[in-house]
């Protein structure tokens, strides 16, 4: 559980994905034992075991119900206090399987470009795997003779989704179930901004003259594998706070800055945004369409990229044309041009681009 006594501005929270996994695990355990527990230990995607409080536990024949309330810590977004609810049904016709569906308040994917099945629930891949793993852990030997259908719902999800960009992304009818680690760090707090600056300062004292800035845990793991010669303190998770990280790099006198990221955040940087939080700025798909046009993509492809709301869609369209590497390299070059204009003659810049599985797809220069 979270430390309620942590200093203000530093308390971490849990993602909608982690809370969904905890609710699903509790409900599954209810089917195994006949009673849903009021506390459940849940394995997070980052490997941590965390205990969650469980509410509304009930078992009715082959179906069990459980709910976990999201606590976002000191980074409360519009899904803070959401009731992540799991209804788990024993499926004797599906031995060994875990079937995941979305109920009321969980959005439905209606457009490509998100890495999710069109027509399916907006439950991202990492939470999907995490929910499945926790159900399997709770089910134990019962999986040998039956499967489990897990329906995740969020009673306040429709209302909460109005405060997100989901509708513009083609996710309709509710929120998305998100989270790559299970933990919500206080990215929007002054304390986290201070930790970014401090991290860059530490990198400056190492004597290597380089700092590697990443937008999150997956991209940090990716660039660490690409640059194994650097010590761990040279890598700083800047989150959405590019502005603070770059200013700290200038002040520290660092001679090289490496930025590792995925296409969405890098597009925002290329378009001149220095705070890249989803709520602060939208992806300029016109910029991506222009890059595609410069590489010879057909006008109808460029227009489709321009009209779509995600950078991922642009990358997938260009991949399909065999121009994915060239497209992502051009985007990385645009990031360098934008930052060199903002910080002229301050440091050498390198940009590494990874896909959503943490694999390298491009770099510049």
Swiss-Prot record:
NCBIfam families registered for this protein in UniProt: cbiD, PRK00075.1-1
SUPFAM superfamilies registered for this protein in UniProt: CbiD-like (SSF111342)
Keyword Iron part of the UniProt annotation: no
Pathway assigned in UniProt: Cofactor biosynthesis; adenosylcobalamin biosynthesis; cob(II)yrinate a,c-diamide from sirohydrochlorin (anaerobic route): step 6/10
Domain of life according to the entry: Bacteria
Family: Belongs to the CbiD family.
EC number: 2.1.1.195
Keywords from the named record: Cobalamin biosynthesis, Methyltransferase, S-adenosyl-L-methionine, Transferase
Entry coiled-coil feature ranges: none
Protein name as annotated: Cobalt-precorrin-5B C(1)-methyltransferase
Annotated catalysed reactions: Co-precorrin-5B + S-adenosyl-L-methionine = Co-precorrin-6A + S-adenosyl-L-homocysteine
One Gene Ontology MF term: cobalt-precorrin-5B C1-methyltransferase activity
Family annotation (HAMAP family): CbiD
GO BP annotations, alphabetical order: anaerobic cobalamin biosynthetic process; methylation
